C-alpha cells in the first residue's frame, strides 16, 4: 500500500541527511559558527582560535589570560569569558588589579592588544612556550620586582614583550650624558650600590629597543657653500687692487688745481722750433718767452702755484676766466702742461729720478719766479669739440 507521499509522487526526504547547522536557531536567519566547525589547533595562527562579535569564542584562548580562557573547555562558557574581556577593554588606561585567588599563576595582562603578542610568538601560542621564547631571545637587566600596590607590571612577569617608552629613553640619554660628564662619580655610585638589590624599573637594553637606532647621514658640504666660497675668493682681489709697480708716487705732488695725470704728461710733444724762444732752468721747467703768466714758487714738497684767474673750474675742462670767450682745445692743454709740469725724458725710470728728492748737496735752487707760456687759443669761430 503506497504511503501518503507516494500518491503525489514527491520524493521522500530523510531527516538524517540534514546538516546540524540547519537546526541552530537564529533570530536573523544567519548561520552561526559552532564548535564542530572549528578544527583542532594545527599549529597555524589562522586556525588556532576565533572570537566573534556576537560572543562566539572557540579554540585555544589561553594566551589571552589564565583567568578566563582554558584550552579545550573555552567553548563551554563563552558568555562569561567575553563579559570579562569586555570589562577589561572598557577600562582603557586602568590596568586590571590582581585577583586574590590563589590559583592565579600570573597577573592579568596590561590593557594592550593581545595581537602584538600573537605576532611575536608565532606559531606557539601557549603561555609556557611564550615565556621561554622571550627569555631566550630577549635579555633583561634584572628580574622584575613584584608589585606591591596590587597593579600588574610589564615585562617577563605578565608575559608581554614591551618596548621602552619615551620617558625611559630620555632617562637613558640623561644617564649617558651624566656618565660622560662625570665618569668617576658614576663609577663610585655603581660600586657603592649593592649587587643583590633588584632594579625597581626593569626595562630592555638599549640595543634591544627599537628607539635606540640612530642614522647619521653625512652628505658633505653643500653646493651653496662652495659657490659662496668661490664668490668670496673672486671678490677678494677686486676689493684689494694691487699697487701700481710702474707708476711710483712722486715726492713733490702738484696741487689739485694743476693736472697730475702722468699718462697725459708722457704724450706731451716736445716744443717745436716754431714756438717762441724759450730757455731751460736748472730744475727742468721749460719757460717759453712771450706773453707771460707769473707762477710763484712754493716751498719744498709742493708744486708750482697757478694764478687764481687761470684755475680750473668745476668741470676741469678749461680755464675759468678765458674759457668764457674762447674755445679750449687739446693742443692748448698740451702746451699748458708743457709750461707748468717738467718735461719727461726717456722712460718711467728717468721720470722717477726727476721726481725723487735729490741729495741736499746736489740740489739746485728754485728760482723765485718762473715765466711760462701765455697760452694761445684758437679763434672763437673754431668748431673743434672740447675733449674732457
UniProtKB/Swiss-Prot annotation:
GO cellular component terms listed in the entry, alphabetical order: cytoplasm; cytoskeleton; endomembrane system; plasma membrane
Sequence repeats: 237-243, 250-256
Chief localization: membrane
Residue list for modification Phosphoserine: 19, 27, 39, 65, 77, 101, 113, 121, 139, 193, 207, 209, 212, 298, 318, 347, 350
Record GO terms (molecular function): small GTPase binding
Alphabetized UniProt keyword annotations: Cell shape, Cytoplasm, Cytoskeleton, Membrane, Methylation, Phosphoprotein, Repeat
UniProt xrefs under InterPro entries: Cdc42_effect-like, Cdc42_Effector_BORG/CEP, CRIB_dom
GO biological process annotation, one example: positive regulation of actin filament polymerization
Region (Disordered): 1-28, 165-206, 237-257
Record flagged with keyword Cytoplasm: yes
List of residues that carry Omega-N-methylarginine: 53
Biased composition (Pro residues): 239-253
Membrane topology of this protein: Peripheral membrane protein
Basic and acidic residues composition-biased segments: 167-191
Modified residues (Phosphothreonine): 34
CRIB domain boundaries: 38-52
Presence of the UniProt keyword Ribonucleoprotein in the record: no
Subcellular location: Endomembrane system; Cytoplasm, Cytoskeleton
Region of interest: 2 X 7 AA tandem repeats of [PT]-[AT]-A-[ENT]-[PT]-[PTS]-[AG]: 237-270
Complex and partners: Interacts with RHOQ and CDC42, in a GTP-dependent manner.
Function: Probably involved in the organization of the actin cytoskeleton. Induced membrane extensions in fibroblasts.
Annotated family: Belongs to the BORG/CEP family.
PANTHER family: CDC42 EFFECTOR PROTEIN 1, CDC42 EFFECTOR PROTEIN BORG
Comment block on domains: The CRIB domain mediates interaction with CDC42.
Protein name: Cdc42 effector protein 1
UniProt organism field: Rattus norvegicus
Amino acid at each position: 500500500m503506497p504511503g501518503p507521499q507516494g500518491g503525489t509522487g514527491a520524493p521522500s526526504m530523510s531527516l538524517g541527511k540534514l546538516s546540524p547547522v540547519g537546526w541552530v536557531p537564529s533570530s536573523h536567519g544567519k548561520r552561526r559558527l559552532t564548535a564542530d566547525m572549528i578544527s583542532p589547533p594545527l599549529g597555524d595562527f589562522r586556525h588556532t582560535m576565533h572570537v566573534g562579535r556576537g560572543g562566539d569564542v572557540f579554540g585555544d584562548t589561553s594566551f589571552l589570560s589564565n583567568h578566563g580562557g582554558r584550552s579545550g573547555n573555552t567553548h563551554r562558557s563563552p558568555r562569561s569569558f567575553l563579559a570579562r574581556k569586555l570589562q577589561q577593554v572598557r577600562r582603557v588606561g586602568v590596568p586590571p588589579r590582581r585577583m586574590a585567588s590563589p590559583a592565579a599563576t600570573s597577573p592579568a595582562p596590561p590593557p594592550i592588544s593581545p595581537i602584538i603578542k600573537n605576532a611575536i610568538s608565532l606559531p606557539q601560542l601557549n603561555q609556557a612556550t611564550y615565556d621561554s621564547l622571550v627569555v631566550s631571545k630577549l635579555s633583561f637587566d634584572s628580574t622584575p620586582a613584584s608589585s606591591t600596590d596590587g597593579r600588574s607590571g610589564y615585562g617577563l612577569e605578565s608575559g608581554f614583550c614591551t618596548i621602552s617608552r619615551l620617558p625611559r629613553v630620555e632617562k637613558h640619554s640623561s644617564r649617558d650624558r651624566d656618565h660622560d660628564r662625570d665618569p668617576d662619580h658614576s663609577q663610585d655610585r655603581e660600586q657603592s650600590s649593592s649587587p643583590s638589590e633588584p632594579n625597581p624599573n626593569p626595562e630592555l637594553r638599549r640595543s634591544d629597543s627599537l628607539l635606540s637606532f640612530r642614522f647619521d647621514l653625512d652628505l658633505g658640504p653643500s653646493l651653496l657653500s662652495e659657490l659662496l666660497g668661490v664668490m668670496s675668493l673672486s671678490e677678494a682681489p677686486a676689493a684689494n687692487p694691487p699697487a701700481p709697480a710702474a707708476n711710483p708716487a712722486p715726492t713733490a705732488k702738484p696741487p689739485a688745481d694743476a693736472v697730475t695725470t702722468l699718462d697725459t704728461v708722457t704724450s706731451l710733444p716736445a716744443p717745436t722750433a716754431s714756438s717762441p724762444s724759450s730757455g731751460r732752468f736748472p730744475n727742468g721747467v721749460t719757460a717759453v718767452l712771450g706773453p707771460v703768466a707769473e707762477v710763484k714758487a712754493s716751498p719744498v714738497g709742493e708744486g708750482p702755484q697757478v694764478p687764481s684767474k687761470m684755475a680750473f673750474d668745476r668741470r676741469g675742462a678749461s680755464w675759468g676766466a678765458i674759457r668764457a670767450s674762447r674755445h679750449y682745445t687739446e693742443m692748448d692743454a698740451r702746451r699748458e702742461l708743457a709750461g707748468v709740469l717738467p718735461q719727461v725724458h726717456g722712460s718711467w725710470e728717468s721720470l722717477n729720478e726727476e721726481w725723487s728728492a735729490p741729495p741736499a748737496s746736489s740740489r739746485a735752487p728754485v728760482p723765485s719766479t718762473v715765466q711760462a707760456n701765455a697760452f694761445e687759443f684758437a679763434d672763437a669761430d673754431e668748431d673743434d669739440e672740447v675733449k674732457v
